[in-house]
Amino acid sequence: MKKYIKEQIKKSFEIKQTIYENENLINKIEEVSKLCVALYRGDKKTILAGNGGSAADAQHIAAELVGRYGFDRPSIPSLALTTDTSCLTAIGNDYGYDNVFSRQLEGMGQAGDIFIGISTSGNSKNIINAFISAKKKGITTVALVGRDGGEMAKMADVALVVPSDSTPRIQESHILIGHIICDIIEKEIFGDGVN
């Protein structure tokens, strides 16, 4: 069993090493970080969504921004579309599950906001529909995905594609990327910045 545990830890290291060496992905993480910093300086918000583990990641990232990531500072506006069960079930019942996020974006999203859709496959229909709604409202779209990026990577203004086919490794990498972005936002707006 110990050997298996070590193999899993090693696999986690390996995908992070791949990300570390992927200059294109590093540049895109920097691009999204800069977009978010500019967004917050302009009084806008990030909106996030995902399904299953990706829903948990959306909530986690939003909580780091609204609460705090590394130090005490004013709250940063961020919203996960996965938290309101009444809204999710009403929209799911009346419009279908494929529209649970797009309908919320129609009501709460504003031009200049950023929508971050999270999916390990990049093919979640409800996130794809949310991208369509976001584009109509002038909301910048970011895909945080894995595998080949799927349809979401093709549709997004910026696609952060974790180069792996393993759902657990993709999810681990998504939260790493989310944490890096939160850290940069916090330090750029309320700290001494990042080199």
UniProtKB/Swiss-Prot annotation:
Q: Name one GO biological process term.
A: D-glycero-D-manno-heptose 7-phosphate biosynthetic process
Nuclease as a keyword of this entry, yes or no, is no
By sequence similarity, the record places it as follows: Belongs to the SIS family. GmhA subfamily.
Q: Which GO terms describe its cellular component?
A: cytoplasm
Q: What is this protein called?
A: Phosphoheptose isomerase
Q: What is its EC number?
A: 5.3.1.28
- Please list the residue ranges annotated as the SIS domain: 35-195
From the Swiss-Prot or TrEMBL record, state where the protein is found. Answer: Cytoplasm
UniProt pathway: Carbohydrate biosynthesis; D-glycero-D-manno-heptose 7-phosphate biosynthesis; D-glycero-alpha-D-manno-heptose 7-phosphate and D-glycero-beta-D-manno-heptose 7-phosphate from sedoheptulose 7-phosphate: step 1/1
**Originating species:** Sulfurimonas denitrificans (strain ATCC 33889 / DSM 1251) (Thiomicrospira denitrificans (strain ATCC 33889 / DSM 1251))
Query: Could you tell me the keywords of this UniProt record?
Result: Carbohydrate metabolism, Cytoplasm, Isomerase, Metal-binding, Zinc
A Pfam family per the record: SIS_2
InterPro entries in the record, alphabetically? GmhA/DiaA (IPR035461), Phosphoheptose_Isoase (IPR004515), SIS_dom (IPR001347), SIS_dom_sf (IPR046348), SIS_GmhA/DiaA_subfam (IPR050099)
Known partners and oligomeric status: Homotetramer.
Query: Residues that bind substrate, according to the entry?
Result: N51, G52, G53, E64, N93, D94, S119, T120, S121, S124, Q171
Q: Do you know which CDD domains this protein is assigned to?
A: SIS_GmhA
Entry function: Catalyzes the isomerization of sedoheptulose 7-phosphate in D-glycero-D-manno-heptose 7-phosphate.
Cofactor(s) recorded in Swiss-Prot or TrEMBL:
Zn(2+)
Q: Which positions does UniProt annotate for Zn(2+) binding?
A: H60, E64, Q171, H179
EC main group: isomerase
Q: Name one GO molecular function term.
A: D-sedoheptulose 7-phosphate isomerase activity
Domain of life of the organism encoding this protein: Bacteria
Any additional notes? Answer: The reaction produces a racemic mixture of D-glycero-alpha-D-manno-heptose 7-phosphate and D-glycero-beta-D-manno-heptose 7-phosphate.
